[in-house]
Amino acid sequence: MRFLRKKIASVYRVRLLATVIMMACGLSALGRPGDKLMNRPYADLKRWHLGFSVGLHFQDLKFTHNGFITADGQQWVAEVPGYDPGFCVNVLADLRLHQYFNLRVSPGMYFGSKKVEMLDYNQSPDAITTHMTQDIKSTYVVVPIDLKISGNRLRDTRPYVTGGVMATFDVGKKKSEALMFNTADVFLTCGFGCDFYLPYFKFNPEVKFCFGLTDILRHKRPDLDDNPEMLKMTESLAKVKQNMIVITFYFE
């Protein structure tokens, strides 16, 4: 229950922030006719343009267990009990394909961490809790490629949605732990945001959801052959996939 409460609280925080961003987009669209001329009326007619972004991201792991039971009757399960925000920074290249379509490439760096808790599922309720924890720090080089689909411009705002893929490479140094993960992964991504046209640049808050496609768990662990207490964690898992929520602020 403690894990569930933490996850629910974290999800509600992310949803609240996304709701605030969408409300800001809606309120900005309610400009009165004749207020003023539009900012940067020809900004979207450029064949290509550059920009950069900063933001936050939340990492999660989806564990699939295989039901493995140790010789002493333990059945270990793992989960991420809560989300810690990480920092991300990217550069942006945007290519105009059509009035409503843009191709965007935004390589960058994601810095973050997540905590994994592993518990013995078979222990009795009145027993002393048997568990292990592992803090995982990650430094990702990311290469997102997105198709941006924009709506009609409403004075100085323009809502949009995105879809694409993102390749990631974890370049941080790793030491031997109970769980080890592959350095490379590929994500499917989808998101939404809104362009705000300011006098000198466009400001775009965006929320993106990223779903990992590959099993990142290292199943072969010869380094733990002499340490069955740590090896049983890997043996208890069929696969592990990554998910992320990314909140980004673009300046173009």
Locate each region found by the language model:
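Outer-membrane beta-barrel channels and translocator barrels
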Residues: L45, H98-Y100, N152-D156, Y197-F201, ...
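Residues that define the transmembrane beta-barrel architecture of outer-membrane proteins
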Residues: K46-W48, Y83-F87, K137-V143, T157, ...
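Predominantly the C-terminal beta-signal and adjacent terminal strand-loop region
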Residues: T183, P199-E252
